[in-house]
Design a protein with these regions (language model features):
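Long, domain-scale functional regions
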Residues: 1-190
């Protein structure tokens, strides 16, 4: 299902976004190909609609990559960002498809490693009212922790993400793999 995150939707991001949530919403889209049957490498899922922009995530794993090859947790200099996503991956798309991707100001200030936060609390710290002013402008990013939290059925939005194991069957983002997020730990710099 798609949920409109207004201030009247309990425990939501309250940012007027539209987000898909639940076990298996029909939120698939083919990006980077015009083939009649979408190649698996071009299959994405819509996280949500934020203003006039649609945020996508690959439907399957992109592979095993390090967030960074050095002991540094700054997104602007991470190898996953500069080398892989906004490097190899982006340059592998034709200019037609590259031009469909908006340059976005990603909030990358990070947050303290807090195991007792809900999706809304993570949202506020990552990109909402309590977020850092540190941004990074790029076409490709990663999901936020709160994106994962809000992809579960709304029944879980009051659950601390540390205890999200029971939500796996009702969270379309769960692919039973560890995944990187763009949110770094602000507790240390490496």
């Amino acid at each position: 299902s798609m949920y409109y995150h207004t201030t009247s939707l309990a425990n939501s991001a309250a940012d007027n976004s539209y987000r898909y949530a639940g076990a298996n919403p029909n939120n698939y889209v083919c990006f980077g190909s015009t083939a009649s049957t979408c190649p698996s490498g071009n299959l994405y899922r819509i996280i949500g609609v934020f203003g006039s922009e649609v945020k996508l995530i690959k439907a399957t794993s992109y592979g095993s990559y390090k967030w960074n090859s050095s002991e540094n947790n700054t997104w602007s200099s991470s190898t996953l960002n500069a080398g892989t996503l906004n490097g190899t991956y982006l340059s592998g798309l034709s200019s037609t498809w590259q031009n469909k991707i908006a340059t976005t100001n990603w909030k990358v200030g990070g947050m303290s490693q807090n195991s007792s936060a809900t999706a809304k609390q993570y949202y506020d710290t990552e990109i909402g009212s309590s977020s850092s002013s540190t941004t990074y402008s790029a076409k490709i990013g990663l999901m936020y922790v709160s994106d994962y939290g809000f992809a579960a059925s709304p029944d879980y939005w009051t659950t601390e993400l540390f205890n999200y194991e029971p939500s796996k069957s009702s969270n379309w983002m769960n692919i039973n793999l560890n995944e990187w997020t763009i949110s770094r730990s602000s507790d240390n710099t490496n």
